A protein has these predicted regions:
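Bacterial N-terminal signal peptides that target proteins for export
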Residues: 100-117
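Short, low-complexity, charge-dense intrinsically disordered segments
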Residues: 53-59, 81, 88-94, 105
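Metal-dependent amide/peptide-bond hydrolase catalytic core
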Residues: 133-134, 307-317, 321-564, 568-573
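Acidic/His- and Gly-rich active-site-bordering loop/insert found
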Residues: 133-241, 248, 258-267, 445
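Sec/Tat signal peptide C-region and signal peptidase I cleavage site
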Residues: 128-132
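Bacterial N-terminal signal peptides
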Residues: 114-127
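Acidic/histidine-rich catalytic neighborhood of metal-dependent amide-processing enzymes
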Residues: 235-236, 242-320
Length: 573
């Protein structure tokens, strides 16, 4: 439970007196904690797009420091460009026909080698070698890249969204493959897509979910315009490349690949490409669950965004699957007061009341609480670290009682967010004129609660801290947190994929500080998991919601292949 120690919410990661939070071990002011080891060790674990304001500052500082050192580019070697794609891209720029272009023929030996490699890859995947050999992954990868570039070019910035055009583009691709697709709107322009690839019916369906809306993109600072879908050095650039049009297109192409293989799995595979995730999903996934629940069939599992295969320093891969999420409790504080001319102010105005309330919140620090999924997450990561960190993560509850370790641990914004509720002031509104005192002034707070927290109790605490009955607290978005079983058949299938396709990479059930549309489906009884089969470095992750968002052609191709392997592994259980 929150302890109520006054602190600075502008800097939730500052070194603090841990004794107040945990009730023991007073820290000595003279002992400055050592440089955080965790923020280095866990740098690969940052979940893209879920940073607090503090995290953004940190990222900005890193960028500035890199610029000072003259390091502008990713140190990660870039994948070799796909020649076919580059040729097509050049063709597009020259205004040539986009489709049906003759491919340059490759030497027969290369083709034979490619076919042999596919058979070997299929064997490694533990699947049916003839099936995998029949699928032309290179061609599927090229098609995936083309479809993604086309969909990125459809501007679906939310607000207002306008996802129908993107949903229609995906529907055309599916129908060209003989897969029936339906596009429906929750309101004009807010379209979502549903498609269902029939299986042999031995097991309940699995849903692949991704959203088609994107966060706004200011073209300043981008290497290419954010809605160009440009291809350079083996990467597709554009808003939504990773979050989440790239995911939607890989999921769609997995249906296409399974259809082309002629060997259905034992489950129906349902694709949902939805509107409105970025502003809470009420006009997309939420609308579907409420108004079209029949589209979910009696699905057992759902896969969506949330986590992925992390590429840590030294090239080590760690598969993280989000099984639980923090939950949003977005609120608006509204202060009222007498309006008037700025030259003759009364003692109290709406603006001064609001500032006083925000200052009280700024001084308040929420308490540390280690919830079970978070404890299990760090315990699972422990074997990947060296001593003494390994033991501390394995027994995190005990370790956090040491104020020095707590300070070190919470210096990393993501780790800090995983052990407490957070409150981040974001939107401020007052008068539009310098010389006019407004009657209303408001502030929006992006609060995030740990799994198991009750929003009503949190709001009561918020009112208690503000201690001003004239300030109205309105809830903008709130729902209870949910989680999925980390020992399910789907998790077993992901472990099988990691063993056969990812060199035995460890599989870690994770908790993410942000939220996805998963909760709508968990509430409907579908076990939902945040896992995208892309291998992403920290540099890749930083492009989500940032500038130069991009996904590699290699990830698109391997993503489709891995997803097909995963669905087949799920099928054979
Ligand atoms: Zn997203």
């Amino acid at each position: 439970m929150p302890c109520g120690e006054p602190v600075d919410i502008e800097n939730p990661c500052r070194t603090t007196d841990g004794s107040a939070m945990l009730g023991r071990h007073r820290s000595r002011g003279s002992n400055r904690p050592p440089e955080s080891l965790l923020s280095i060790c866990f740098s690969s674990n940052t979940t893209a797009g879920q940073f607090t304001a503090h995290g953004q500052e940190t990222d900005e500082e890193i960028r500035k420091s890199r610029a000072r050192r003259g390091v502008n580019k990713s140190v990660r070697p870039e994948a070799a460009p796909d020649e076919d794609l580059l040729a097509r891209e050049r063709g597009k720029r020259r205004g040539m026909l986009l489709r049906g272009m003759t491919r340059p023929s490759r030497p027969i030996l290369t083709r034979c080698f490619a076919r042999a490699a596919l058979v070997v890859a299929a064997a490694l995947l533990g699947g049916d070698a003839s099936l995998a050999a029949d699928l032309d992954w290179r061609r599927l990868g090229s098609e995936t890249t083309e479809v993604l570039a086309d969909v990125i070019r459809i501007d679906t910035q939310n607000p207002p969204g306008g996802e129908t055009a993107a949903a229609n583009a995906l529907a055309r691709k599916l129908e060209a493959e003989g897969i029936r697709a339906e596009v429906f709107e929750s309101s004009p322009g807010r379209g979502s897509l549903h498609a269902r690839l029939p299986g042999s019916g031995g097991a309940p369906p699995v849903i692949l979910l991704a959203h088609l809306d994107v966060v706004p993109a200011d073209p300043r600072g981008w290497r290419f315009p954010p809605f160009s879908g440009a291809l350079e050095h083996g990467y597709v650039y554009g808003r939504g490349a990773l979050d989440a049009k790239g995911v939607a297109v890989v999921e769609l192409m997995a249906l296409v690949a399974l259809k082309r293989s002629g060997q259905p799995i034992d489950r129906d595979v349902i694709l949902l490409a939805t509107a409105d995730e970025e502003t809470g999903g009420k006009a997309g996934a939420g609308w579907i669950v409420q108004h079209r629940p029949e589209l979910l069939g009696n699905a057992e599992y759902l896969l969506t965004e949330g986590d992925h295969i992390h590429l840590a320093h030294g090239g080590r891969k760690v598969v993280q699957v989000a099984v639980a999420e923090k939950t949003p409790c977005w609120v608006k504080l509204i202060a009222r007061g007498e309006g008037g001319h700025g030259s003759t102010p009364p003692a109290q105005t709406a603006v001064t009341r609001l500032i006083r309330a925000l200052d009280k919140l700024r001084r308040y620090r929420t308490g540390v609480r280690l919830v079970r999924p978070v404890e299990e997450y760090f315990a699972a990561l422990a074997p990947l670290e060296r001593e003494p960190l390994r033991s501390k993560l394995a027994h995190l509850s005990e370790a956090l009682e040491d104020p020095a370790f707590l300070a070190e641990f919470t210096r990393n914004p993501r780790q800090n967010a995983l052990i407490r509720n957070t409150m981040t002031p974001t939107v401020l509104e007052g008068s539009p004129k310098t010389n006019v005192i407004p009657e209303d002034a408001s502030a929006q707070l992006d609060c995030r609660l740990l799994p198991g927290e009750r929003p009503a109790e949190f709001l009561a605490l918020l009112r208690e801290v503000i201690a001003d009955e004239t300030i109205r607290v309105e809830t903008l978005l709130s729902f209870p947190a949910s989680s999925s079983d980390s020992t399910s058949g789907l998790m077993a299938a992901i472990r099988k994929l990691a063993a056969t396709d990812l060199g035995g990479a460890p599989v870690i059930p994770s908790v993410i500080p942000g939220f996805t549309d998963s909760h709508y489906f968990r509430d409907h009884g579908v076990a939902s998991y945040g896992f995208v089969p892309f291998v992403l470095s920290e540099d890749d992750e930083k492009t989500v919601h940032g500038i130069n968002e991009r996904v590699s052609v290699e990830n698109l191709r391997d993503g489709v292949r891995r997803l097909v392997a995963l669905l087949r592994a799920l099928s054979t259980r």
